[in-house]
Design a protein with these regions (language model features):
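Conserved alpha/beta-hydrolase "acid-adjacent" motif
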Residues: 237-243
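Conserved HGGG/HGGXW glycine-rich cap/lid loop of the alpha/beta-hydrolase fold
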Residues: 9-82
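Gly/Ala-rich beta-loop-alpha elbow adjacent to hydrolase catalytic centers
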Residues: 115-119, 123
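Active-site loop/oxyanion-hole signature of alpha/beta-hydrolase fold enzymes
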Residues: 29, 72-112
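Short beta-strand/loop motif that positions the catalytic acidic residue
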Residues: 224, 230-232
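Hydrophobic, aromatic-rich cap/lid helix
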Residues: 190-219
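Catalytic active-site module of serine/aspartate enzymes centered on a nucleophile-bearing elbow/loop
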Residues: 253-302, 306, 336-338
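Flexible "cap/lid" loop of the alpha/beta hydrolase fold
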Residues: 124, 128-129, 134-164
Length: 338
C-alpha cells in the first residue's frame, strides 16, 4: 500500500480511478476503475473513528467509475498507518494537517474532501486551516454541539476498556484476527477490524481527541465559504440529525441531504451515491480560486440550502441549501428554521 511521511510517521493511502475509467470486475461491489491521472477531479475520503479506509472502498470504487480520482486515507493511529501510543499525536486539527499533507504529497492543489463522523470533523478543520485547498466538502454524520454528551457516554467506557483492560482486549484482538477475512462480507471485516487492532494505540487516539477541540466553533463555521453537502440521519444519538441540520444552516454554501438510516450509504447506496456524484459534478463544473500549487510528490509538512422540499431534484446551485429525501417522502414542504 502506498504511503507518505508525516512528522516522521507513515500515513497509508490508496488511489482509485480518475479520468476515462477503465472498469474491471474487481472490488467490493464487483467493479472498480483503476486508471488514475492525478490531475482529474481529486476526491479524498476520510474514515470514521477507529475504522480504516476500507470502510470507504465501495464508495471510492463507485465514484471512480464515474470519472473521479478518488483517494482513501488511513489517518495516523488507524488502519495501515503507523499507530503510536502517544496521545499528543492525535487531534482533529492534526488529522486535518495529515489530509493536507496527502494533497501535498500527490501534488494536488484542490480536492473535494468527504469525511464520515471523525472524517467529517476533519474536513471542517481543513476548511478552518486551509480553505483554499478545498473544492468542496461532503460532511457525513458530523459530531457537533448536540452529539457531545452521547459521544462522551459512548466512548468513555470504550476508553476505559482499551486502557485499563488492555491485557484482556489484546487477547480478544488475537482471537478475532484468527477469523479468516474471506469468511466475512466486506463490512463484516470493517467492523471486526475495530477489535482486531492493538488496543493501546486506539486508546491513545480517543484520549487525544478528548483533550482537543472536536470541531471549529460555530462562530467560525459561519465564515466557511466552501460548498458543502451535509448528510445526516435520524435515530443516532452520537450523530444526531440536529447537528447535520444545524451545520447545513451555518455554512453559507451548505446543503442538507437526509439519509434514510445510518447504513443507507453502505447497504443501499444508489440514491446517496447519485447525490454525491451530482455534487461533485457541480463543484468541479464551477471555477474556484486555487491555492499555490503544491510540489508533485513532495514530502508532507511536519508542521502543524435548506430550501423547500419538492418531488423535483435538488437544484444544483452552490449557494442554496436543500433537504433531499426519498421520492416517497418529498411531499411535505419544510420551512427553514432559525
Amino acid at each position: 500500500m502506498p504511503s507518505f511521511r508525516f512528522q516522521n510517521r507513515r500515513i497509508a493511502y490508496t488511489e482509485y480511478g480518475g479520468g476515462p475509467a477503465a472498469i474491471t470486475t474487481e472490488g467490493a461491489r464487483g467493479r472498480t476503475a483503476k486508471s488514475a491521472p492525478a490531475a482529474s477531479r481529486p476526491v479524498i475520503l476520510v474514515h470514521g473513528l477507529l475504522l480504516s479506509q476500507e470502510m470507504h472502498r465501495p464508495l471510492a470504487e463507485d465514484l471512480a467509475a464515474r470519472g473521479n480520482h478518488v483517494i482513501t486515507i488511513d489517518l495516523l493511529g488507524h488502519g495501515e498507518s503507523d499507530r503510536p501510543r502517544d496521545m499528543w499525536r492525535y487531534s482533529m486539527s492534526i488529522f486535518g494537517e495529515q489530509v493536507v499533507g496527502l494533497m501535498d504529497h500527490l501534488g494536488i492543489e484542490q480536492a473535494v474532501v468527504m469525511g464520515t463522523s471523525l472524517g467529517a470533523n476533519t474536513a471542517l478543520e481543513i476548511a478552518s486551516a486551509a480553505p483554499g485547498r478545498l473544492r468542496g466538502m461532503v460532511i457525513e454524520m458530523p459530531v457537533l454541539d448536540n452529539g457531545l454528551l452521547s459521544s462522551a457516554l459512548t466512548f468513555t467506557p470504550l476508553l476505559v476498556a482499551l486502557t485499563f483492560g488492555e491485557p484482556l482486549m489484546k487477547l480478544l484482538a488475537r482471537g478475532t484476527r484468527a477469523v479468516p477475512r474471506r469468511l466475512l462480507p466486506h463490512y463484516g471485516n470493517v467492523v471486526l477490524d475495530l477489535v482486531r487492532q492493538e488496543p493501546g494505540p486506539s486508546g491513545a487516539v480517543i484520549q487525544g481527541l478528548f483533550f482537543g477541540r472536536i470541531a471549529p466553533h460555530r462562530s467560525e463555521r459561519h465564515t466557511f465559504q466552501t460548498p458543502a453537502l451535509v448528510l445526516g440521519h435520524h435515530r443516532d444519538p452520537v450523530h444526531p440529525f440536529s447537528d447535520a441540520g444545524m451545520l447545513a444552516k451555518e455554512l453559507p454554501n451548505g446543503r442538507l441531504l437526509e439519509a434514510d438510516s445510518l447504513v443507507e450509504l453502505r447497504m443501499q447506496p444508489e440514491r446517496l451515491t447519485d447525490e454525491i456524484a451530482a455534487f461533485l459534478d457541480e463543484v468541479w463544473g464551477s471555477p474556484r480560486a486555487v491555492a499555490k500549487p503544491a510540489p508533485k510528490r513532495a514530502a508532507a509538512s511536519n508542521g502543524p440550502v435548506k430550501s423547500r422540499v419538492t418531488k423535483s431534484p435538488v437544484k444544483r446551485a452552490p449557494a442554496k441549501r436543500a433537504v433531499t429525501k426519498r421520492p416517497a417522502a418529498r411531499k411535505a414542504a419544510v420551512a427553514k428554521s432559525g
